[in-house]
Design a protein with these regions (language model features):
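Extended, low-polarity transmembrane helix blocks
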Residues: 1-27, 72-181
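Solvent-exposed, well-ordered loop and adjacent helix/strand elements within mature globular domains
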Residues: 15, 21-55
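Generic beta-strand or strand-like secondary-structure segments
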Residues: 39, 65-66, 83
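Membrane-interface junctions
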Residues: 46, 60, 132-135
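Short hydrophobic "helix-edge" motifs at membrane interfaces and signal-peptide entry regions
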Residues: 49, 62, 109-111
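Hydrophobic, membrane-inserted alpha-helices
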Residues: 57-66, 90-91
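Alpha-helix C-terminal capping segments
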Residues: 68-70
Length: 181
């Protein structure tokens, strides 16, 4: 069990780290911050650059923390946030199956994050070496709630219409017009 938990945590953490660097720097065949920002704008996350930076940082930082087994519940929450946003903004409309562009892969990653927050990172981790023993069902539920809640707040803020307010006109207000008659 301990070996399997460590293997799962490290592999998933490294993969998230790689995805984050694709978004931020264009590494590993990614589109970099500008390409990611354009995609985010196209799905209604505006300003795209800020959302791309946040997603890339969450994946890079969360993936690194997860791979190291350091602050595991916080890492899980950040990665749950990214995956719940991906489900909400891209995959939910396609149903569950990945072959149809659905959310099954993202949901599986969320389940892994919840499981790691519940069980902890294992003995081969910085959390264990430093005596950080924050884990269990309540921690897992808090990581899930924080990830989904934080992502919802950010996506709602990013979905708001950001058009500038109309410029003032020289046309008098109705009350002013009535007073001059």
């Amino acid at each position: 069990m301990k070996f399997g938990l460590t293997l799962l945590r490290v592999i998933v953490g490294v993969l998230f780290f790689g995805h984050g660097t694709q978004k931020l720097y264009g590494w590993f065949g990614g589109h970099g911050i500008e390409g990611t920002a354009g995609f985010f704008e196209s799905i209604g996350l505006k300003p795209g650059r800020k959302h791309a930076t946040a997603a890339g940082a969450a994946e890079t930082g969360g993936g690194a923390l997860l791979a190291l087994g350091f602050l595991t519940p916080a890492a899980a929450a950040s990665l749950i946030g990214v995956m719940s946003t991906a489900i909400r903004k891209v995959h939910a409309k396609n149903g569950p199956w990945a072959g149809d562009g659905g959310y099954e892969y993202n949901l599986a990653l969320i389940a892994i994050m919840v499981t790691l927050a519940d069980l902890g990172p294992g003995h081969v981790s910085l959390d264990h070496a430093l005596g950080i023993e924050v884990k269990g069902p309540l921690v897992a539920l808090l990581a899930l709630a924080a990830g989904i809640g934080g992502a919802t707040v950010l996506t709602e803020a990013g979905s708001q219409d950001t058009e500038p307010a109309p410029a003032p006109t020289d046309t008098p207000e109705p009350a002013e017009a009535a007073a001059t008659v």
